[in-house]
Regions:
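Nucleotide-sugar donor-binding/catalytic module of glycosyltransferases
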Residues: 1-106
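C-terminal subregions of glycosyltransferases and related glycan-biosynthesis enzymes
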Residues: 39, 65-67, 72, 94-177
């Protein structure tokens, strides 16, 4: 449908020059709502994404801050159009020590170990918080009611206590993957 912004993501093999294929899937979750997305730091890699002209017209509007291009693409798809996923891995996503988002750990055991190792790290990093805030400031007038409430609830959590954050997460049914 060329009338609405659409993005299609494909999966990717995680690949390392030293080890070959680390994992046959880079993406393990497929968010289509803000409630599923906001605590992911928009963890869908956009290297294997395609989008239509209507999406291009949305994302070419400048923001005051960008976390990553992937972040804006997913937010725009969720707020203004459609997000689709092809679950097949269609490319190799190279892992190396200088990746902007860091190396993907590969196995489930390594992912759990990494989560334990980083247990003191905030759930949402500053860059993605500021990117969401800039997106909201730019598109506030166009964002629909429920999505607007979800973003506003998410943004105010930064200043709230742990207990209030936990209540808000339950109240708004945010997913913590």
């Amino acid at each position: 449908n060329q009338g609405i912004p659409q993005v299609v993501y494909t999966n990717a093999f995680l690949w390392s020059p030293d080890r070959g294929i680390i994992s046959d899937k880079n993406t393990l979750t497929y968010p289509t709502t803000l409630r599923q997305t906001l605590f992911l730091n928009t963890g869908i890699q956009g290297a294997a994404a395609i989008f239509n002209r209507a999406m291009c017209e949305v994302i070419e509007q400048p923001l005051s801050y960008y976390a990553m291009h992937d972040h804006v693409l997913l937010l725009a798809g969720i707020c203004f159009g459609e997000v689709h996923y092809l679950h097949e891995s269609l490319m190799y996503y190279r892992q190396h020590e200088h990746n902007v988002t860091g190396n993907a750990p590969g196995s489930i055991a390594k992912k759990i170990a990494l989560m334990w190792e980083n247990r003191g790290v905030r759930l949402v990093n500053r860059e993605h918080y500021e990117g969401l805030k800039a997106f909201y400031e730019r598109f506030e007038a166009q964002i629909k009611g429920d999505d607007k409430q979800v973003i506003e609830a998410f943004l105010v959590m930064k200043a709230e206590s742990f207990i209030v954050r936990a209540i808000r997460i339950i109240q708004y049914k945010f997913q913590l993957f």
